[in-house]
């Protein structure tokens, strides 16, 4: 059901973004006036969602294994429909979101019934890469080929079109080539994790990385499946907002 909670958690702390620096760090002023430093898992340019002085949400999770007790989870950004929209910027969360969506049955119509899910399985020509999720279909599935599934957290939009990537990504280009490489013995699936509820479709970010756009279209022609999944981000939960169509070009 659209709008149903997929992940729930204790309420996040809200604050104001002071600055993001050294790629991994963000200073946030809490409601109390205290300024804390949070880990930023998104090391890219964060096009359209990085707004010093804007509202953000961070999670407090102190641990002796972590240098920082805070993690930056969400940012408030201009919405495609006007007003503001909360965006999930923690790239480390995307795989868990897609896995939860599969386990909840939200992708059954496109993937078929799934018997098992494994994470970070080695693959590729030199077996040096790791696929985000490796799916084993149910024995009763009409297509019993194993599924290699790559997840891409997507936060950049133009109008209501979600775009990935927002910068040149040689790693992302490599992932497309490796997905093509598992065909036809296996299914190859690219899942853009649309981490904001205000998008209507997905396309490759040609203006940011023209080569990625070329490889994206080559992958589609080769048989790679693209399944954009949309989510809503809230203070204490993330909701399922359904599938979105794919466009082959940004323009």
Curated annotation (Swiss-Prot):
It comes from Prochlorococcus marinus (strain MIT 9313). It holds the Pfam family SfsA_N. This is Sugar fermentation stimulation protein homolog. The gene is sfsA. InterPro entries: SfsA, SfsA_C, SfsA_N. GO terms for molecular function: DNA binding. Belongs to the SfsA family.
